[in-house]
Amino acid sequence: MTDVARILKEARDQGRMTALDYASLIFDEFMELHGDRQFADDGSIVGGIAYLADQPVTVIGIQKGKNLQDNLARNFGQPHPEGYRKALRLMKQAEKFGRPVITFINTAGAYPGVGAEERGQGEAIARNLMEMSDLKVPIIAIIIGEGGSGGALALAVADQVWMLENTMYAVLSPEGFASILWKDGSRATEAAELMKITAAELYQMGVIDRIIPERGYFSSEIIEMIRSHLIDEITQLQAKSLEELLDQRYQRFRKY
């Protein structure tokens, strides 16, 4: 098994910690909030408010299940437009009250069903991209499993984007890439090699800002590492003027 194939397998492992795991272990007094105030509450996106070292923050994540029943309830971590609108509602609330936003991303992509498209899936994702680019509070996005397509990017227009060591971030799935390029989805591993989807490759290209090591560390050590980095980075981001914060976020994405 190649290194990329191993990372792809580990990124999709059902045993990985979920967004709710990180929310409860990194932060204090996490309180989940529900609903997009327009249509429904999408269980594949979770979010709420919490404390990080006595600092109020907004935490949002894409939630996969740990078993079949849970995955059905979470739509296998593929958000509907209601999920993205719920996330945006929480981000605008964070902006109103001056709370930094931290997102945890683990999705193969946004749900591509007919109903989701009819309810404006593309618009919901596009609006998140637009609003996040100008959100007037610090944003940190962390890839904790799969970071697939626009479904992941809709929570990743951030001042800092981090990845755990054994995760992936790509414009589409390797299977989708292989199906388009070679009409053969079984060549996914070969596609993954070409796509540059690993944390190490993306860090080298400047797409992400930090890699959180996993190999050789216990889960508790990884949690403490993320917590420490978040405290330090949020302190630095809050020290910037609003003009500087937004300009640097804009330039970060324009350089691609």
From Swiss-Prot:
Q: Which reaction does it catalyse?
A: N(6)-carboxybiotinyl-L-lysyl-[protein] + acetyl-CoA = N(6)-biotinyl-L-lysyl-[protein] + malonyl-CoA
Tell me what organism the protein belongs to.
Streptococcus equi subsp. zooepidemicus (strain MGCS10565)
Q: Which GO terms describe its biological process?
A: fatty acid biosynthetic process; malonyl-CoA biosynthetic process
Q: Which InterPro entries match?
A: Acetyl_CoA_COase_a_su, ClpP/crotonase-like_dom_sf, COA_CT_C
Know the name of this protein? Acetyl-coenzyme A carboxylase carboxyl transferase subunit alpha
PANTHER family tied to this protein: ACETYL-COENZYME A CARBOXYLASE CARBOXYL TRANSFERASE SUBUNIT ALPHA (PTHR42853), ACETYL-COENZYME A CARBOXYLASE CARBOXYL TRANSFERASE SUBUNIT ALPHA, CHLOROPLASTIC (PTHR42853:SF3)
Q: One Pfam family name from the record?
A: ACCA
Residue ranges annotated as coiled coil are: none
Catalytic EC class: transferase
A GO MF annotation of the entry reads: carboxyl- or carbamoyltransferase activity
